[in-house]
């Protein structure tokens, strides 16, 4: 029998979180059995939820209060968690994250292949943070004329400004700071993807884990920067093991980062 949607936007419900989606949302059900998807919730949480979106068969909610925290919950250590579209499990322990992903593999094999097979436990990373060897940072100018740099928000092209990421090497933080200072000092124009005007599109950084070498690349909607020598000298002064500085030209109207 099809469930009748009885929930309305701005309703408040207390639910238990019993599952997790592939995007890291906790899943609970109303007394009528209607599924409610809730960011920043973990299996085992009992939460007071504000309904923010109602669809035909399910709803989305926002945690207003954690009435009883899950044993898998941990303190969030990222200041842009839930704004940035990068991480969805910072509020759960790493062991819990591995179990969630293991279960998703089991569910996919059962649903798609119709097989009930043994899945070995996921082998976790020795160091779950600071492991990335590449980052690509989009840039914008805010209404005050200041350069913002960071990551796209979840399911959007809205840039979430940040000066760090817990998944990247610490040296990337310093590269971001040097480049942002250069852009502010030289007043370079920043690319606007809606108008296709402005010069600087992305900062692209690579790191060699074994060598410690760093490559810095600016992707631009043109051929050159105002003062490339100033940028190179600033990077050389502040970034140990700087191996190369690259200017990549991408003049296309595209979401592809490099040209």
Q: Where are these predicted regions, by residue range?
A:
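Accessory RNA-recognition modules of RNA-modification enzymes
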Residues: 2-259
């Amino acid at each position: 029998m099809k469930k009748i949607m009885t929930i309305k936007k701005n309703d408040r419900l207390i639910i238990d979180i019993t599952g997790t989606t592939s995007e890291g949302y906790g899943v609970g059900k109303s007394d009528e059995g209607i599924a409610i998807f809730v960011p920043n919730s973990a299996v085992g949480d009992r939460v007071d939820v504000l309904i923010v979106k109602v669809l035909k068969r399910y709803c989305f909610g926002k945690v207003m209060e954690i009435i009883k925290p899950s044993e898998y919950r941990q303190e969030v250590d990222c200041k842009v968690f839930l704004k940035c579209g990068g991480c969805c499990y910072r509020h759960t322990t790493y062991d819990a994250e591995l179990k969630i992903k293991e279960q998703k593999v089991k569910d996919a094999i059962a649903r798609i292949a119709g097989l009930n097979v043994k899945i070995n436990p996921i082998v976790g990373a020795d160091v779950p943070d600071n492991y990335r060897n590449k980052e690509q940072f989009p840039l914008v100018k805010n209404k005050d004329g200041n350069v913002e740099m960071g990551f796209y928000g979840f399911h959007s092209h809205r840039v979430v400004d940040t000066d760090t990421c817990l998944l990247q090497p610490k040296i990337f933080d310093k590269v971001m700071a040097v480049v942002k200072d250069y852009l502010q000092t030289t007043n370079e124009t920043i690319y606007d993807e809606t108008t296709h005007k402005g010069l600087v599109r992305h900062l692209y950084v690579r790191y060699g884990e074994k060598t410690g070498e760093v490559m810095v690349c600016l992707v631009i909607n043109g051929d050159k920067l105002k003062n490339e020598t100033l940028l190179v000298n600033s990077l050389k002064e502040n970034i140990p093991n700087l191996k190369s500085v690259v200017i990549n030209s991408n003049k296309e109207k595209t979401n592809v980062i490099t040209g």
